[in-house]
Amino acid sequence: EDDGGIGGMIKLMEIAVKAMSPGINDPGTAVDVVINLGQLLNKMLQFPSLTSNKLPDGDIVVITNNISAKDLMISIVQPIRLYSKNDVVILSILIKALTFAISGPHISEENKEVVHEELDALKFDLKKNVDNPIDKERVLKLFNELNIKKLQDFDLSNK
């Protein structure tokens, strides 16, 4: 059965999460995987949510549902984000990968908004879980440097 490429992306996500585990501790592999996932997400986010093809032998139209941007974020990005919420290197690469993922000219505004929501969640996790103020500030600067718009500011001053 054709999974539309999501099966391979899930395997890559699993490799990234395992590479970050204390038993394996291979951040280089995790970085490589996140970079590659950013490129794949860029391609996947360009597909429309529905496609239709008329069969040549009649009046039958086959409608295909492609995986939504929201499902991609839940299946591919969230596990990496949640597992690496204390790792500023992976968080930095994930910010860059997600920014690249929505950089194409054929990405819908709806898909961009879904990725921006994931970036909001990443920013929230960063503010809440990274204790070192210098590291935290370095990663937060990425949001400005990459000109990421529509991100909410979370007040975590009491944390």
What are these regions (language model features)?
Residues 1-159:
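Short basic (Lys/Arg) and small-residue
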